[in-house]
Amino acid sequence: MAFTLTNKNVIFVAGLGGIGLDTSKELVKRDLKNLVILDRIENPAAIAELQAINPKVTVTFYPYDVTVPIAETTKLLKTIFAKLKTVDVLINGAGILDDHQIERTIAVNYTGLVNTTTAILDFWDKRKGGPGGIICNIGSVTGFNAIYQVPVYSGTKAAVVNFTSSLAKLAPITGVTAYTVNPGITRTTLVHKFNSWLDVEPQVAEKLLAHPTQPSLACAENFVKAIELNQNGAIWKLDLSTLEAIQWTKHWDSGI
């Protein structure tokens, strides 16, 4: 079902990162009511830039580290919901690419995303009288087929795709729909230099960037298109400046 962002309230976790900031710029052009950015490091210049793009949109920043205990996330969300009354979309975008940092990669890329999602269900779950909502989780094409030199990062992104597909199937119970946007290799600081697992490939970043990539702005434009298309359970591939819905192959079914 098509979704209009006009007059909507959106929470964007890591909305000041490379793809995140360009996506935030595209979002404010859609005449949101509120864009609430949760990020680890404040960037007043970026917030001011977003506000200047569309002064009709209220842009708010809260410091947030996705690795905090879930109780702290719930406390922050209580503050946001008390102020806005309603939130329409949650975008989970926190991510790091450094396979030297195994525990932190898993904590940021997967556990933090699961915890933030779990926390907002307290406010959205229709079984608790909530209105439902939309979750957009940022995965990666490495969640389909790994960059095998960074198996920890790739593994977390595969987990995001699987978790989100499960959320989508739970929508009749919770009232919360979900889908993933999965960027291909995008020209951001994230991919300019990073560490492979056990240093199996010291030149992994350079080798990736020798192949065709996409600019961050093109990825951001397709990101917002995916939000507007609003297809529960969709697995979107955002690669080489295109947007494509992936048809996932089922190899097994639980039967329940």
UniProtKB/Swiss-Prot annotation:
PANTHER family: ALCOHOL DEHYDROGENASE (PTHR42901:SF1). NAD(+) binds at residues 12-35. One of its GO terms (biological process) is alcohol metabolic process. This is Alcohol dehydrogenase. Pfam families: adh_short (PF00106). It comes from the Eukaryota. It is an enzyme of class 1 (oxidoreductase). The active site is at 153 (proton acceptor). InterPro entries: ADH_Drosophila-type, NAD(P)-bd_dom_sf, Sc_DH/Rdtase_CS, SDR_fam. GO terms for molecular function: alcohol dehydrogenase (NAD+) activity.
